[in-house]
Amino acid sequence: MSLHYTLSVVQASKVGSNLPKPMPPQIEESLSGSDQSAALWMGMAKWFGEDIRSVLDKIRTISFHEVEEIRLRVGQPLLVRTSDEDIFINREGKVSSPDQAHIVNREDLACALERMTHSSVYAAEEDLKKGFLTLPGGNRVGVTGEAILQNGQIQTMKHISSLNLRIARDIPGRGFKILPLLLGTGGILCHTLLISPPRAGKTTLLRDLIRIISDGVPQLGFRGQTVGVVDERGELAGMWQGVPTYNLGYRTDVLDGCPKASGMNMIIRSMAPQVMAMDELGHSDDVTAIEDALRTGVRILSTAHASSLEEALVRPTLAHLLEQGVFERLVVLSRKHGPGTIDGVYDLKTGRIL
């Protein structure tokens, strides 16, 4: 099965022989302010070809810490998205109107894909079929184009037209605020589901909770737990050649790039975790795997896309798990006051807001 990769041929000089290395989430900590932002922009720019890289390297008026997405669309202006606005960028790296911004062309996308797949687009075919790539460090790249179907299933993609690089953030400490609300009788972690719409910080919060649960919290009398993480899309740990980019704790074992359903069974058999963590429940196979996992006594910690309990209940997979009483706590996140805003923590057994 081959990927019909129909973008223009990329010159070696455009891609460069030294492909990007993973960028740690705390890159250039010795720098501060604008210098640190510039260093982070340069680190991210390495994933792109010469033209886009030149633009991003020049950015000085937009703090990298505020950026959530970098979007490339063929024939459209280069766009940087923050939490509250869309910003168009010209060839000098300055904020501009759409008609004065750098216009993305097919070669810009071709160069970026070559670098993001380490010059092996075919090796990334399975991810591209799902519509995304995951870069070292947990940064995720959405991909759209023309889907090629076989028996109603996407087999490949051609004429790639858009890339959306979503920048992963590691914000330690947020989990401390809600962990006490997730503990039940005897200080045992409750089966917990975190829900939010896209870009509202549920993966960031899940990552922090994993680390805290793994390390333990002496102040709460909460001992560290063995945590098994099934990181299907590579966003939680940001694994690079077997080493996690993000700190997930002393007692955490990560299964990277494996479908959640088969991964849960595998990690339970091999690592005997006390807590099983995963991102973005949604497939029907996930239900059976979670029900099997519960029989072993493992605690479940997961996320899903939904903006409210009512919305979650109209999604078949989530509705089944919620109606069966699998989850004991529900954490609802939003962007009301920026990503990671906690709208409420609910005790699903009593219906109370904690």
Per-segment meaning from a language model:
Residues 2-137:
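N-terminal accessory targeting/assembly segments
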Residues 70, 143, 231:
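Residue-level signature of catalytic and energy-coupling elements of molecular machines
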Residues 115, 119-189:
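P-loop NTP-binding catalytic core
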Residues 140, 147-150, 170-172, 233-236, ...:
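Conserved nucleotide-binding/hydrolysis micro-motifs of P-loop NTPases
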Residues 150, 155-159, 328-354:
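Conserved P-loop NTPase
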Residues 175-232:
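P-loop NTPase nucleotide-binding module
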Residues 214-265:
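P-loop NTPase switch/communication element
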Residues 271-330, 335:
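Conserved P-loop NTPase nucleotide-binding/switch module
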